[in-house]
Amino acid sequence: MDKQEWKSFFRFIEGGSEAELQQRKDALAGVLQKVTDPGVRSDIRRMLRLIDEEVLIRQNLSSRRQVRRSKSA
């Protein structure tokens, strides 16, 4: 992927809903099974890792917010 494609992907990750992220992850996982080019496979695996990372970050932030709310209540 070129620089512009990566920038577009990062914008998607930052702005996409959890459902959109999951849909993209599922689609990428399906493509990964069909692709044989090592460079493309590497890009897809990186994209999958980045999506997983974003989902975990969002879950962590959500958990922290809930803890703060319960402490202030």
Locate predicted features.
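N-terminal acidic leader/helix
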Residues: 1-34
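Short, charged, amphipathic alpha-helical segments
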Residues: 22, 38-49
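Short, charged, intrinsically disordered terminal tails
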Residues: 59-73
